[in-house]
Amino acid sequence: MLDPDGLVVGEGYHARCGGPHAEVHALAQAGGRARGGTILVTPEPCAHPGRTPPCVDVIIGAGIRRVVVAVKDPNPIASGGVERLRAEGIEVTEGVRSESGRILNRRWLRWVQDHRPWVTAKAAISLDGRIATRTGDSQWITGEASRSRGLELREEHDAILVGVGTVLADNPRLTRRLGLNPGDDVRRVILDSRLRTPNDAVVVQSDPEQTIVVHTSAAAREDRERLDAAGVERVELPADERDRVEIGSLLDYLGDLGIAALLVEGGAEIHGSFFDADAVDEIFFFVAPMIIGGEATVAVSGIGVATLEMARRYHFEEGHHHDDDLELQCVRPEDADVHGSD
């Protein structure tokens, strides 16, 4: 938010679904200094009442003179903000740094356009692509700095997904721990075709209403009743050819829940299922300079491909060092930031 002299007097971002939008935060910070100024937004200000009031009403009420928009809102329900602002006599400039805006909002844009979440696969691996030793020892392959970056990724996603094998082996909490989104609890999704998740698992004992256990028709009635009594959300979805939860149906279901960004943390079979379904949009692999070898667990299993022509191709977008570890970020070529947006 710029005042009439071009000085920055406010800024904001949309921290959580259902919470105030970025414009509201920026205008609240600016107060009366916003009148007659310019507000710069990434997506077009919303024009419809949903979980929050329309942002265009807040902008009009604040006496803003000019609005600069990077990308139009593709949602036909929420769009129309530009037209509304112009009808009120406010100057609107569109398409400024639109490519940067698209990259910044590509997870949200995927959900708006396809009504499915953007899927990010995350793993900590050795140089030879292993996520555990042959005995199952996996804590810790990467160092503390890499693990902290992994926790940041949880803050950027609406839900965390693992398979029941990870629950049985590691009993993870699958929580946000950095406090970057206060009041916004991440959803926890467990793929468990036969409902083997035990009632004493942390994801069941702690905030069970935030846990979704997804199974197929193969689950026994007593296990359905057991988890229902524990208070978790349980949903049956179709099975694929391997009698596991069909990934396309899962993404449709999560999209209907409003989950726009899904972080898939494994294990190997779960990662394999998502790659087999060509459902992974983004990859974060944290690589430690070690060799495990032998029959240790690989990062991605599943069915795989028969030829290199069939391999899933991605674009290397960024790489960062975390002490001795290397963070590699890849996206689909069509979603890549090929121009280096800043």
For each feature predicted by the language model, list its residue ranges.
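Active-site beta-strand termini and strand-to-loop segments that position acidic
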Residues: L2-P4, Q113-D114, R332-P333
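Generic structural signal for well-ordered alpha-helical scaffold segments
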Residues: L27-G31, I60, L109, L151, ...
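Proteins enriched for Cys/Gly/acidic motifs involved in redox and nucleic-acid/cofactor modification
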Residues: V82, V96-A124
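Short alpha-helix boundary/capping motifs
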Residues: A30, A87-E88, V112-D114, E282-I283, ...
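Zn2+-dependent cytidine deaminase-like catalytic core
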Residues: L2-S100, R187, I212, S273-F275
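Short capping loops/turns at secondary-structure boundaries
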Residues: P74, A78, E94-R97, V112-R116, ...
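Hydrophobic beta-strand positions
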Residues: M1-L2, A124
